[in-house]
Amino acid sequence: MTGEKIRSVRKERKSGLDLLEPDEEPAATGPAKHRGSKIFSGGNHRISRSSSSPGDPDGAYPVHECVFRGDVRRLSSLIRTQNIAQKDVHGNTPLHLAVMMGHKECAHLLLAHNAPVKVKNAQGWSPLAEAISYGDRQMITALLRKLKQQSRESVEDKRPRLLKALKELGDFYLELHWDFQSWVPLLSRILPSDACKIYKQGINIRLDTTLIDFTDMKCQRGDLSFIFCGDAPPSESFVVLDNEQKVYQRIHHEESEMETEEEVDILMSSDVYSATLSTKSITFSRAQTGWLFREDKTERVGNFLADFYMVNGLVLESRKRREHLSEEDILRNKAIMESFSKGGSLIEQNFEPMRRQSLTPPSPNTISWEEYITAETGKAPHLGRELVCKESKKNFKATVAMSPDFPLGIESLLNVLEVIAPFKHFNKLREFVQMKLPPGFPVKLDIPVFPTITATVTFQEFRYDEFDESIFTIPSDYKGDPSRFPDL
């Protein structure tokens, strides 16, 4: 197993446990509020009433109730007519409950009907996070595979809209710079910077970068080009060129059985994180300049005149769970992280995860359905293994420079960023600019990319231009190497 692969997996606990995500929509608490949820469940699930229970007087959560009670027979009869993506008053979906309570038959039935895996409850935990806590290896593996499948399907569903938007957008050259910082001692000095060049022509995009992969642990550098060809079959759309070694690799989505098993080993031996950038109280105020006579700050960023704003009310909320870890796991993880903060690597640590067995199940649940569903919102009775959780909140101070002169609109930028989302730091940029920003285009902004790391992104140059089509093709003297970039 390569250090890069391990790094990628520990980075996000891989696909399902993003280190930093924007606020989700508030959990709706009744059937009528879940009309939009059907996109997650692979079908148009009709909401119907069933016989109510004392704790659920409206009968609003029949699927949740039969999962809670472990009633597989009733679940199988309800599942075709009910919304299996619905959240209850505590933000849990039926899949959350099945996993937390160890009702494996219910969980597998829900997964067979494409119940959403990435969705989070009110505490910020996905079903995969809850499965790691419970510790059943088979269930963790099933959820991980379904999560990857749903992620691929989501990309494929967006593809026609994305290609249409790219085709309507003019051809251009865009240059932006990344500078990473951290408030962790010693970490800032090893953090990278990067100058990215983006070429867009028709439905093709090329990104030249020196930073292909970056986590809060380590970065991978090189002279690299990422090419997206919109008219190629999905399996051949994405390719990465290593311009130093003159090799290329197509980005694959399927993983081998061994890779999946290794990923499960790392999930079961690592902390589970939930980090959310809360934007509920966000406000923008004009940045000021001058000592005696204060005035609004307006400066040139690259070729564009921009108004500077202070971003107020951004809060980074993070939670870390480790009830599934042994004392040995905790000490080992701490040693690895200390090595990273000093510039070390996984290879130097000789890190090779051991094959993990399922944990002993937690004590059987003694809470009734009525007690669970009538509990005060935000104070749900805990189900599953006893929590060992640390929580923290950090106010994120940021500035953003908005220019009315930038030729590209934010919506167009979002479409371009969606194409290059495999680069995780670009995905964080996309999430950030989806907020309601002041007027103009964000030519310079601060964004959090990991709980301890922020980046200043500067759009230095933009021009409409035409390019030789050859820059979107693989050079004839490059050789294919399917293992050059294990993280992709």
Swiss-Prot record:
- Key words of the record: ANK repeat, Chaperone, Endoplasmic reticulum, Membrane, Repeat
Main site of residence? endoplasmic reticulum
Query: Which GO MF terms are attached to this record?
Result: signaling receptor binding
Compositionally skewed regions (Low complexity) per UniProt: 41-59
Please name the gene that encodes this protein: ankrd13c
What name does UniProt use for this protein? Ankyrin repeat domain-containing protein 13C
Q: Which organism is it from?
A: Danio rerio
One GO BP on record is: protein retention in ER lumen
Q: Where is this region: Disordered?
A: 1-60
A single GO cellular-component term from the record reads:
endoplasmic reticulum membrane
Residue spans of the ANK repeats: 58-87, 90-119, 123-152
| Role noted for this protein | Acts as a molecular chaperone for G protein-coupled receptors, regulating their biogenesis and exit from the ER.
Do the record's keywords include Chaperone?
Answer: yes
Among InterPro entries, the record links this protein to: ANKRD13, ANKRD13_C, Ankyrin_rpt, Ankyrin_rpt-contain_sf
Spell out the subcellular localization from the entry: Endoplasmic reticulum membrane
